[in-house]
Amino acid sequence: MGWLKYFLRELLEYVSLMRTTWLAVWGVFFLAGTSHAWDGQYQVIQQDPIEKFPKWTGILGSVQAELNKQADIQAPFAGGWAEFIEKTKSDDRLAMIKKTNETFNSMRYVPDQKNWGVPDLWNTPIQFTQSPDYIVPGRMSGDCEDHAIAKYYALQRLGFTQDELRVLVVKDLNLGVGHCILGVIFGGQCLILDNQIKSVWPANQIQHYKPIYAINETHWWQFIPAGTAAPAAAAGGQAD
């Protein structure tokens, strides 16, 4: 997938910007002074700045204003974005997570090339839930990062903090392709919301994904194989 190649290239170009201040664990993220290996397989190291990921920061720059402006506009899905939030906001937190996953998983997976005529386009939740007429009017669709982004912001609107949320880029070892999912820190573990998996599962019970990096609104984290030295500082280039 084009978006995975894009981010991998950025990851290599900006590896010099690493600094180890947080430990994010594939299964749970928590504060720590140094990085450790996850289950003997990965070190997870905080990286900054997120501005090196312009597609992600582009979403951040527009989505909150869009959601606030259109909070009362009824999108086609589930009676509308605002109605979904209203119906879900009184649920317990685990029910919120499950309902968010179920609701957005009901929307079709359609690659960006087919949906928008471009190889890679990251959509805001409102864009994702209001499909272009040239696909199927009234049917919502998007690719994996669109599902993950919509779930991220739905849970934020329901009261989850960004520290509890991670957009995760992984490699699907079964299919040999890149994939994007959402991780939610809940009950001392990381729950995975995935458009390819119907139910919500703890990350440590999903064996066919190789984590590459995680990102939220303030930081990103790289997964490095255990036993591999953290790359030394080096000159970095400019992101596209």
Features from the language model and the residues they span:
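Bacterial N-terminal signal peptides that target proteins for export
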Residues: 3-22
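Short non-domain terminal segments
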Residues: 5, 15, 27-28, 36, ...
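Bacterial N-terminal signal peptides
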Residues: 21-32
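A structural boundary/capping signal
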Residues: 33-240
